[in-house]
Each structure stands twice: as C-alpha cells, then as structure tokens.
Amino acid sequence: STFGACRLCTVEDDRGRLFASCSEEPRDGMVIYTHTERLRKHRKLIVELLLAAHCRDCTTCVKSGECKLQELAHNMGVLKVRYENYNEIRPVDYSSPAIVRDPNKCSCLF
C-alpha cells in the first residue's frame, strides 16, 4: 500500500476534492485535474512545509546543486520559507560503510 505522506502528487476531482493520486485507485468516469491554480498553490504550500521541516544547511550540503527538493522549490517559485523549523537536530547515522543516513534531511522517516 502507498503511504502518500508528501502529498506532492495531489490532484483534484470534478467535485473539488483534493487527494494524493498515489493512494487513490482510478475509477471509470473519474475526471481528474492535475494543474489547476488551486493545485499549484496547494503544492507550493506543501513544498514550503517540507522545507520548514528540513534541515537548512543547503549551502554546505553535499547534494547542493543536485538536490531534488531545491529543484522543486525553485521550479515552484518558493523563494523563502514562511514557517519556523521546530524539529530537533538528530544525529547522522554513519554506521554503514555504503550509506549515510541523515534523518534531518527527510521528514518522512521519523
């Protein structure tokens, strides 16, 4: 089953209902809108909230310039984050020789 936590795939049906497309099965006769003004505003807000919960060390991050979240924020016109980050800084997990897991970079894993 799909968790649908990020909500970036939110779509709108012909009744005005917003829902995550990744967690809804298509049905015959469904009318789905993917690029309405309402959806653009909604997705922009979601990106701002993701950034608010995200560690803000972008300029020193190894993914800077290649970060999908940075790219998404830029493409959506998010120039600043209007919300405070209230998450505590958690330790980075270097226990694997192949993977560095930084829980401060992904709000969906805690």
Predicted regions and their residues:
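Fe-S ferredoxin-like electron-transfer domains
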Residues: 7-110
